[in-house]
Swiss-Prot record:
NCBIfam families membership: talAB
EC number: 2.2.1.2
Biological source species: Kluyveromyces lactis (strain ATCC 8585 / CBS 2359 / DSM 70799 / NBRC 1267 / NRRL Y-1140 / WM37)
Biological processes per GO annotation: carbohydrate metabolic process; pentose-phosphate shunt, non-oxidative branch
UniProt-recorded name of the protein: Transaldolase
Similarity annotation: Belongs to the transaldolase family. Type 1 subfamily.
Pfam families documented for this protein: TAL_FSA
Reactions listed under catalytic activity: D-sedoheptulose 7-phosphate + D-glyceraldehyde 3-phosphate = D-erythrose 4-phosphate + beta-D-fructose 6-phosphate
GO molecular function, one term: transaldolase activity
Length: 334
């Protein structure tokens, strides 16, 4: 049904064709100098992306500025480092917001993933730093891992503080349901990392249509539309453009510069695959997790892929934030 409409209009490239399906394109990078040509609406960052960008000479001034700020504000070395790292994340976000017209996602320290109160506290500190830069909280999404504690923190931030949250490292239907019930602004269901797990565990080869990560996002999208949830579904973590095209029409897609480049240099058509009306007919029946921690934990535990990938993701982001802390600490002590 949507295939012919994709061909009626000729677009300059596949990226423009993707945007024409109704999907909002988001740049997944901390390297803000590389994203303007893609004209994304928003940008997402994480500790790994910031760490990669921080190692580039082009961003040395941001690091120096954050280090000086940390030295002034902190009472001891540990405080100075923590403040400087928060400041650095916000400096990257502020610079990105000069390039994108929408919002930037800034991640809370992944080591707080199992501490609701500490997550809320850190989110408020990050927003305060943005506001000191003249950035309204409406232009910031606080990224939090989709643990039980993270989802509860997100609910509190949205309800009590009117702070927008992006729940990340989302691999399971239970996480997605609880996130919608928490009324969060946006979720980031991961596609490529789900595919990685299934390829490793089954040894099978998947097409874009049979890709377990693509199927996961479709089922979440259909469920949200069927039950009238306003939470934005933003597919994330892609291994190839086939996965991206298979989700054309979904609310948002956050895409790495490498894959954005591929779309920009291709003139292949992109057909709209997902739409709200069809989704309403295909979504599964309503279930609930938000007030039932044992049920949530059991459902997550039953999903080996989601359990392993959530743990692995938190470990990876935690390791990268520690590396970033060490980098900043060395500069403060130099």
């Amino acid at each position: 049904m949507s295939e012919p409409s994709a061909k009626k209009q000729k677009f300059a490239n596949s990226l423009e064709a993707l945007k024409a399906t109704g999907t909002t394109v988001v740049a997944d990078t901390g390297d803000f100098e590389s994203i303007a040509k893609f004209t994304p609406q928003d940008a997402t960052t994480n500790p790994s992306l910031i760490l990669a960008a921080a190692k580039q000479q082009a961003y040395a001034k941001l690091i120096d500025s954050a280090v000086q700020y940390g030295k002034k504000q902190g009472q001891n070395i540990d405080e100075q480092v923590e403040i400087a790292v928060d400041k650095l994340l916000v400096e990257f976000g502020t610079a990105i917001l000069k390039v994108v017209p929408g919002r930037v996602s800034t991640e809370v320290d992944a080591r707080l993933s199992f501490d609701k109160d500490a997550t809320v506290k850190k989110a408020l500190e990050i927003i305060k730093l943005y506001e000191a830069e003249g950035i309204s909280k409406d232009r910031v999404l606080i990224k939090i891992a989709s643990t039980w504690e993270g989802i509860q923190a997100a609910q509190e931030l949205e309800k009590e503080h009117d702070i927008h949250v992006n729940l990340t490292l989302l691999f399971s239907f239970a996480q997605a349901v609880a996130a919608a019930e928490a009324n969060v602004t946006l979720i980031s269901p991961f596609v490529g990392r789900i595919l990685d797990w299934y390829k490793a565990s089954t040894g099978e080869t998947y097409t874009a249509e049979t890709d377990p990560g693509v199927i996961s996002v479709k089922s979440i999208y259909n469920y949200y539309k069927k039950h009238g949830y306003n939470t934005i579904v933003m597919g994330a973590s892609f291994r190839n453009v086939g996965e991206i095209k298979a989700l054309a029409g979904v609310d948002f897609l956050t895409i790495s510069p490498k894959l954005l480049d591929e779309l920009l240099s291709s003139d292949e058509p992109v057909a709209k695959i997902l739409d709200p009306e069809s989704a309403k007919a295909e979504g599964s029946e309503r279930v609930s997790f938000i007030n039932d921690e044992p049920k949530f934990r059991f459902e997550l535990n039953e999903d080996a892929m989601a359990t392993e990938k959530l743990s692995e993701g938190i470990r990876k982001f935690s390791a990268d934030i520690v590396t970033l802390f060490d980098l900043i600490k060395a500069k403060i002590q130099a």
